[in-house]
Amino acid sequence: MERNIIVLDTTLRDGEQVPGAKLNVQQKIEFAQQLKRLNVDIIEAGFPASSAGDFQAVQEIARTVGDSVSITALARAVKGDIDAVYESIKLAQNPLIHIVLGTSNIHVEKKFNRSKDAVLQMGVDAVKYAKTLLPQVQYSTEDASRSDFEYLWKTIEAVVKAGATMINVPDTVGYAVPDEFGELIRKINERLKNLNDQVILSVHCHNDLGLATANTLSAVRNGAEKVECTINGLGERAGNTSLEEVVMGLKVRENHFKASTNVRLKELIRTSRLLTHLTGLDVQVNKAITGENAFAHSSGIHQDGLLKDKQVYEIMSPEEVGADSMELILTARSGRHAFKNAVEKLGFETGEGDDFEALFEKFLLLADAKKEVYDHDVFYLVTQHRTHEEVSSHLYELDSFQVVTNDMYPTATVKLKKGSETFRDSMVGDGPIDALYSAIKALVGLDVQLKDYKINSLSRGKEAIGRVNIRIEYQGKIYSGRAMDTDIIKASALAFLNGINAVLLDAGHDSQAPVSAR
């Protein structure tokens, strides 16, 4: 009998812990809406106790997306965290409190500096309290793969008796190997079914040894009923289990695993592309399922075989995962309906009334200039439109700029707006971008360091749109900025400014430019 595997996506919580991948509230909602289209069963929307911004994002996701998908958020085994989770997710139709507490010796002794019994009691008390708030509670035994098995089981048994409805077994540091992890899940599953066969057994793997997908599939083979993953395998260090790899592994090897998911496969590529666009973190070209070369064949022998029968060298088709529907070609005559459909296919909400009309007018201007508008052009239009909407009085806008470049003294003059104020300054630099960034830094008064600068072409021909991704460091934290424009110097300025605005949003830092620079 085929089992249905529950899929929890934790891109917005665990995935967002990647330096520079932080999203604002609107971006998180945008991505959560796409996860809803993807039809994941549970969205882990964040860690609400960590900041007011994360609390707000989780709350908005629960309110706007939680009508048909379960929403959860992470809590440590303390009352304040559990309260924050409850308050942020309670508007969802099927909310779930997720509690995490370590079980390995190193966690108990070094992290908590308590006895094993004391840590176990912390977990039991946390579950009992969470159950007074909501009926559904998941308990994660952090670092389970390095834990003493009998203590691990003692913890699981105690929290199940306290009311936990899901037990999640994490390979927190990616230490396990597939046969070992599969055996661990088999043993837990065997005991858990005898204890309470209504409790769901889940796994959460990390990719430090490149084994996250293999370990997750081994766990499913050995009785796991739920998997926790991220899109593109996004996550801190080497990343998390890749959702698309697990889902397609179960699909392609259905006879082997005798398990399936509710995920809409045709939304996989679209979801991956949206995440790449929002975070600015590109997928490696040879990444399974979602990489640019995942369905590319350059070998003559392979091409010959494919022409005779695609199944000679393809175990899945690009059409299955939505790769066939990504290329959109629009013209000025495409009309509102076609444009609206194109925007929605790329995972964005189109808005209504005046908002949509303003976006459509921008599309017509671009279509007149470029003649043919592709999917990346639509991405550009929508994100630039959204960015303009989100600018507030304490963030900077680019008013104008001028760059003069020569062999001696490249110079940039920049004028910024912040609310009703304007600021202007000129700087020289080692090239046009350095001069531009030096002028912006002087105006905003923040000592940010440029850590990474990348530029890519997003569309075709001499009118191609360039995308600039930058990463900056401020007070030890990494922030990202990205922008697109047919003028790459302008895109560079906007990306840098977006990174600085991310700093301001994160820190609530209301910087002032020097009076002499105004």
From Swiss-Prot:
<feature type="binding site">
    <location>
        <position position="206"/>
    </location>
    <ligand>
        <name>Mn(2+)</name>
    </ligand>
</feature>
<dbReference type="InterPro" id="IPR002034">
    <property type="entry name" value="AIPM/Hcit_synth_CS"/>
</dbReference>
<dbReference type="InterPro" id="IPR013785">
    <property type="entry name" value="Aldolase_TIM"/>
</dbReference>
<dbReference type="GO" id="GO:0005737">
    <property type="term" value="C:cytoplasm"/>
</dbReference>
<dbReference type="InterPro" id="IPR054691">
    <property type="entry name" value="LeuA/HCS_post-cat"/>
</dbReference>
<dbReference type="InterPro" id="IPR000891">
    <property type="entry name" value="PYR_CT"/>
</dbReference>
<feature type="domain" description="Pyruvate carboxyltransferase">
    <location>
        <begin position="5"/>
        <end position="269"/>
    </location>
</feature>
<dbReference type="Pfam" id="PF08502">
    <property type="entry name" value="LeuA_dimer"/>
</dbReference>
<dbReference type="Pfam" id="PF22617">
    <property type="entry name" value="HCS_D2"/>
</dbReference>
<keyword id="KW-0028">Amino-acid biosynthesis</keyword>
<keyword id="KW-0464">Manganese</keyword>
<dbReference type="InterPro" id="IPR005671">
    <property type="entry name" value="LeuA_bact_synth"/>
</dbReference>
<dbReference type="GO" id="GO:0030145">
    <property type="term" value="F:manganese ion binding"/>
</dbReference>
<dbReference type="GO" id="GO:0003852">
    <property type="term" value="F:2-isopropylmalate synthase activity"/>
</dbReference>
<keyword id="KW-0432">Leucine biosynthesis</keyword>
<dbReference type="InterPro" id="IPR050073">
    <property type="entry name" value="2-IPM_HCS-like"/>
</dbReference>
<dbReference type="GO" id="GO:0009098">
    <property type="term" value="P:L-leucine biosynthetic process"/>
</dbReference>
<comment type="pathway">
    <text>Amino-acid biosynthesis; L-leucine biosynthesis; L-leucine from 3-methyl-2-oxobutanoate: step 1/4.</text>
</comment>
<feature type="binding site">
    <location>
        <position position="240"/>
    </location>
    <ligand>
        <name>Mn(2+)</name>
    </ligand>
</feature>
<feature type="binding site">
    <location>
        <position position="204"/>
    </location>
    <ligand>
        <name>Mn(2+)</name>
    </ligand>
</feature>
<comment type="similarity">
    <text>Belongs to the alpha-IPM synthase/homocitrate synthase family. LeuA type 1 subfamily.</text>
</comment>
<protein>
    <recommendedName>
        <fullName>2-isopropylmalate synthase</fullName>
        <ecNumber>2.3.3.13</ecNumber>
    </recommendedName>
</protein>
<dbReference type="InterPro" id="IPR013709">
    <property type="entry name" value="2-isopropylmalate_synth_dimer"/>
</dbReference>
<dbReference type="Pfam" id="PF00682">
    <property type="entry name" value="HMGL-like"/>
</dbReference>
<feature type="region of interest" description="Regulatory domain">
    <location>
        <begin position="397"/>
        <end position="518"/>
    </location>
</feature>
<keyword id="KW-0100">Branched-chain amino acid biosynthesis</keyword>
<keyword id="KW-0808">Transferase</keyword>
<dbReference type="InterPro" id="IPR036230">
    <property type="entry name" value="LeuA_allosteric_dom_sf"/>
</dbReference>
<dbReference type="GO" id="GO:0003985">
    <property type="term" value="F:acetyl-CoA C-acetyltransferase activity"/>
</dbReference>
<comment type="subunit">
    <text>Homodimer.</text>
</comment>
<keyword id="KW-0479">Metal-binding</keyword>
<keyword id="KW-0963">Cytoplasm</keyword>
<feature type="binding site">
    <location>
        <position position="14"/>
    </location>
    <ligand>
        <name>Mn(2+)</name>
    </ligand>
</feature>
<comment type="function">
    <text>Catalyzes the condensation of the acetyl group of acetyl-CoA with 3-methyl-2-oxobutanoate (2-ketoisovalerate) to form 3-carboxy-3-hydroxy-4-methylpentanoate (2-isopropylmalate).</text>
</comment>
